[in-house]
């Protein structure tokens, strides 16, 4: 049922070292403020911190009370205050207000600000403007890599997507380059590097500069990971906009997985309490179904329940000695498995109820039609109906964006009509959101006569005119075009299937979207790995508007073992989805690779839309 790893699959590196490093550094920073202290933690850092150092560890290092950073006066009576925050202007103003309030009251305390993952000059400037810079000591907690699972690392920076891909803010690129530098220091150099996208290229170049500055740290080291692939989220928006149908993706879409764990409510736990559950490879039930298409999951869980019952029933014919062994060795494991099984059955039932209510089948049918380019008028009507019924502002936006990207922009009549209906249905406050979506290239309007061929000719003009200095005009008129249909054809993203697609025994990565579509990001990775570079993919790169932004760097490394050359680190800049993770795990099983994922944050279609929205839920 689950994807068993091939017997010859390479072993994954041990990423628990990253947790230990982060914990030790935090303890060191806390001990620089000797004695009892109160710790103020920003909400966004609470879940990551919990995975690294729990409350008892903090208490061992003289943290007395914990507070959440929120916009209200602090009630702390401690003589020492420590703030663990993201480098944000609003946090600086909050800290400054506390320090200034103490000054007004004639109270003297010690203040320490720990920025994670790094401090920015702008933050120090705000503290200076507020007149408190001399009263606080500032430090950095370079915690930028959180292992969520044996093969998944997250920077837990969901704001990376909006900051870079909408605002053009490059501040997190240094954080990413530092994270890659740390990985190459701990796990040896990466002999083969590939990448595509403007952000990927900038991050790669900065990372290489860091490597050169500290030359010698990785020299002579045996590489543990043979390949690294950096990919910008805007290279493939389509995959992130599609509804997920693998189990882990559906759990994320339905319940929101946060920092590797999920809150299951009473409808799942069959009690009056919610339960926080860690979802990773240690959960044996979850690990067997996480990458499966949802249609297979119920059958598997039913079979698992029967097997479990059979194991319980074995005890009936046991003598006292056998019963003693059963209780001491097996019973605890069976009870744990039973608890997890009940939870996942409850989660499946809850997902089924919600999806039946939403008419999920009709939604998936519309998405598939958009991906294939059929019945576009019918799909547009479906979206209009969705808006008129006020189903969900986020869902309606998502479908409009999917229509726009797959059709290379909406024809002006449809763009104006859908936008007007949306604003009338959900409110004029969403107007700025449309501006953001347009700016990011997610929801655009075709210029008159902007057919696919016209767009393609502009792209080729962009490539040929760059020497003549005309690149800026060509790029600005074109940067946000998607060319999805042409790319889909070139890379065979829509499989042609005779008869039914077998979701029980899938033959390709398309199973993560019910056999209708191979994720573009995953297909690019597959093709580049096969070719050991971008040779033969020039046309695809051109259609992706990345002619200057696809790179390969291969160094001959005799120390690289055949095992390390089958380990591939994929870095998603701007977030990746659980569907992409499942698809690449499948590819790894088929080809004998093991993929490791590093993402700025795990994302899905709703998070993508929320990042662009100016209306906060």
From Swiss-Prot:
Pfam families: Sec1 (PF00995). It is a peripheral membrane protein. Belongs to the STXBP/unc-18/SEC1 family. The keyword Phosphoprotein applies. GO terms for biological process: intracellular protein transport; lysosome localization; melanosome localization; membrane fusion; platelet alpha granule organization; protein transport; vesicle-mediated transport. One of its GO terms (cellular component) is platelet alpha granule. It is found in: Late endosome membrane; Lysosome membrane; Early endosome; Cytoplasmic vesicle, Clathrin-coated vesicle. May play a role in vesicle-mediated protein trafficking to lysosomal compartments and in membrane docking/fusion reactions of late endosomes/lysosomes. Mediates phagolysosomal fusion in macrophages. Proposed to be involved in endosomal maturation implicating VIPAS39. In epithelial cells, the VPS33B:VIPAS39 complex may play a role in the apical recycling pathway and in the maintenance of the apical-basolateral polarity. Keywords: Acetylation, Cytoplasmic vesicle, Endosome, Lysosome, Membrane, Phosphoprotein, Protein transport, Transport. Phosphorylated on tyrosine residues. It comes from the Eukaryota. Gene3D superfamilies: 1.25.40.850, 3.40.50.1910, 3.40.50.2060, Syntaxin Binding Protein 1, Chain A, domain 2. InterPro entries: Sec-1-like_dom1, Sec-1-like_dom3a, Sec1-like, Sec1-like_dom2, Sec1-like_sf, VPS33_dom3b. The modification N-acetylalanine is found at residue 2. This is Vacuolar protein sorting-associated protein 33B. Interacts with RAB11A and VIPAS39. Associates with adaptor protein complex 3 (AP-3), clathrin:AP-3 and clathrin:HGS complexes.
């Amino acid at each position: 049922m689950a994807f068993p790893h091939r017997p010859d699959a390479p072993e994954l590196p041990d990423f628990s070292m990253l947790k230990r490093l982060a914990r030790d550094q935090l303890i060191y920073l806390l001990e620089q403020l000797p004695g009892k202290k109160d710790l103020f933690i920003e909400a966004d850092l609470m879940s990551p911190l919990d995975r690294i150092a729990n409350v008892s560890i903090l208490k061992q290092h003289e943290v007395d009370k914990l507070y959440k950073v929120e916009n209200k006066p602090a009630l702390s009576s401690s003589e020492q205050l420590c703030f663990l925050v993201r480098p944000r202007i609003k946090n600086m103003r909050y800290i400054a207000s506390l320090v200034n309030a103490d000054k007004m009251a004639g109270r003297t305390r010690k203040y320490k600000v720990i920025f994670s993952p790094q401090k920015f000059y702008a933050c120090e400037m705000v503290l200076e403007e507020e007149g408190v810079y001399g009263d606080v000591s500032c430090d950095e907690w370079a915690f930028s890599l959180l292992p969520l699972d044996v093969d998944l690392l997250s920077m837990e920076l969901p704001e990376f997507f909006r900051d870079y891909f909408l605002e053009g803010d490059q501040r997190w690129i240094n954080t990413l380059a530092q994270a890659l530098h740390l990985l190459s220091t701990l796990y040896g150099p990466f002999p083969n590097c590939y990448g595509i996208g403007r952000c990927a290229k900038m991050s790669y170049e900065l990372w290489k500069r860091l490597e050169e500055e500290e030359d010698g740290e990785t020299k002579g080291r045996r590489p543990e990971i043979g390949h690294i692939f950096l990919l910008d989220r805007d290279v493939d928006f389509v995959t992130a906009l599609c509804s997920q149908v693998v189990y882990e993706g559906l759990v994320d879409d339905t319940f929101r997985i946060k920092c590797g764990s999920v809150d299951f409510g009473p409808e799942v736990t069959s009690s009056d309490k919610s339960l926080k559950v860690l979802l990773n490879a240690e959960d044996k039930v979850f690990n067997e179904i996480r990458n499966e298409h949802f249609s297979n999951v119920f059958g598997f869980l039913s079979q698992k329940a029967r097997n479990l019952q059979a194991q319980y029933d074995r005890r009936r014919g046991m003598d006292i000695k056998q019963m003693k062994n059963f209780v001491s060795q097996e019973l605890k494991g069976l009870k744990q498995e039973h608890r997890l099984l009940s939870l996942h059955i409850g989660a499946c039932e809850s997902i089924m109820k919600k999806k039946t209510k939403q008419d999920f089948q009709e939604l998936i049918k519309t998405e598939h039609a958009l991906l294939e380019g059929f019945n576009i008028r019918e799909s547009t009507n479906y979206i209009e109906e969705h808006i008129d019924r006020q189903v969900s502002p986020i869902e309606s936006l998502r479908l409009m964006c999917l229509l726009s990207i797959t059709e290379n922009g909406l024809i002006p009549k449809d763009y104006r009509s859908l936008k007007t209906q949306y604003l009338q249905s959900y409110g004029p406050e969403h107007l700025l959101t449309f501006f953001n979506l347009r700016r990011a290239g997610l929801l655009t309007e075709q210029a008159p006569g902007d057919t696919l061929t016209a767009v393609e000719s502009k792209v080729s003009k962009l490539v040929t005119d760059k020497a003549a200095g005309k690149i800026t005009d060509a790029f600005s008129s074109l940067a946000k075009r998607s060319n999805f249909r042409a790319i889909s054809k070139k890379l065979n993203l829509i499989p042609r299937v005779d008869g039914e697609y077998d979701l029980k025994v899938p033959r390709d990565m398309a199973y993560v979207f019910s056999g209708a579509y191979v994720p573009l990001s995953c297909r690019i990775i597959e093709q580049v790995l096969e070719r050991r570079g971008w040779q033969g993919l020039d046309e695809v790169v051109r259609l992706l508007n990345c002619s200057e932004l696809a790179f390969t760097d291969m160094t001959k490394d005799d120390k690289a073992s055949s095992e390390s050359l089958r380990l591939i680190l994929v870095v998603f800049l701007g977030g990746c989805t659980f569907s992409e993770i499942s698809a690449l795990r499948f590819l790894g099983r088929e080809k004998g690779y093991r993929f490791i994922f590093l993402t700025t944050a795990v994302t899905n279609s709703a998070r993508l839309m929320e990042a662009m929205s100016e209306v906060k839920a």
